[in-house]
């Protein structure tokens, strides 16, 4: 994207991060360390992680830092952390989405905040991206709850089919990309089972984030150039090194010409 003078204009790329994924006495993630550097917090709603107290504390932390709150619903799979697909009917998917979004929204309301978007988690997210019927079901569920809530989903090499479906149902879409993952030529994430699927070098993670923010191409696993149109960038805060990477990404993006 360029301005009238022909200079490249960098649109603000929102940083989103999965949050509130502890449960009871079990702890996951460094939420307090990451929250100051992100724009959007995808807060677990109790089905893959999180519990009422964790949800309340995470919402409070997000509000303290002015971070936009999103619901992060999943299949009911605490043992598998929501990473296992489940054979759910459309009605069951709608019900589990409304249950989880409503739970987080209620906590937000009590604390003076609100749920501003929805991003499914894990296997539900992957199933939604792989199956147009499941994507339709998720979109219809979000629309039934609040058609003003955007759905966050994966940016691919061609977003047109998903965008058309979102337009048909009347739900805004926020396409996201990943700074720490390798991509296939189609714009899908390279399977974690394959070598090189996850970038561990912080410099490489920051470089990919900057390229995405500038609208530049990435190198796919087959060596081809991949263009992704994304509004938001998913980052992670699972350990000290990932927190450092998030901080560096924030500094790098803030330093870009806007």
Curated annotation (Swiss-Prot):
It comes from the Bacteria. It catalyses: 5-oxo-L-proline + ATP + 2 H2O = L-glutamate + ADP + phosphate + H(+). GO terms for molecular function: 5-oxoprolinase (ATP-hydrolyzing) activity; ATP binding. One of its GO terms (biological process) is carbohydrate metabolic process. CDD domains: LamB_YcsF_like (cd10787). Catalyzes the cleavage of 5-oxoproline to form L-glutamate coupled to the hydrolysis of ATP to ADP and inorganic phosphate. PANTHER family: 5-OXOPROLINASE SUBUNIT A (PTHR30292:SF0), UNCHARACTERIZED PROTEIN YBGL-RELATED (PTHR30292). Belongs to the LamB/PxpA family. This is 5-oxoprolinase subunit A 2. It comes from Pseudomonas putida (strain ATCC 47054 / DSM 6125 / CFBP 8728 / NCIMB 11950 / KT2440). The gene is pxpA2.
């Amino acid at each position: 994207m360029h301005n009238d003078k022909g200079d490249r204009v960098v649109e603000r790329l929102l940083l989103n991060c999965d949050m509130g994924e502890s449960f009871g006495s079990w702890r996951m993630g460094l939420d307090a360390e990451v929250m100051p550097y992100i724009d959007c917090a995808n807060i677990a709603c109790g089905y893959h992680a999180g519990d009422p107290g964790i949800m309340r504390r995470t919402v409070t932390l997000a509000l303290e830092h002015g971070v936009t709150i999103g619901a992060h619903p999943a299949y009911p799979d605490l043992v598998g952390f929501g990473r296992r697909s489940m054979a759910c009917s459309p009605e069951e998917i709608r019900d589990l989405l409304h249950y989880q979004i409503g739970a987080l929204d209620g906590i937000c309301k009590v604390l003076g905040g609100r749920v501003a978007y929805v991003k499914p988690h894990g296997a539900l997210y992957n199933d939604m991206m792989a199956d147009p019927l499941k994507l339709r079901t998720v979109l219809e569920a979000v629309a039934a709850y609040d058609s003003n809530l955007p759905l966050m989903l994966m940016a691919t090499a061609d977003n047109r089919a998903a965008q058309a479906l979102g337009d048909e149902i009347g739900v805004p879409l926020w396409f996201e990309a990943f700074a720490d993952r390798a991509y296939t030529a189609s714009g899908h994430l390279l399977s974690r089972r394959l070598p090189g699927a996850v970038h561990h070098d912080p410099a490489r993670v920051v470089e990919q984030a900057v390229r995405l923010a500038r609208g530049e191409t990435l190198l796919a696993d087959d060596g081809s150039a991949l263009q992704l149109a994304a509004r938001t960038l998913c980052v992670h805060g699972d350990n000290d090194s990932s927190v450092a990477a998030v901080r560096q990404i924030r500094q790098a993006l803030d330093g870009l010409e806007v």
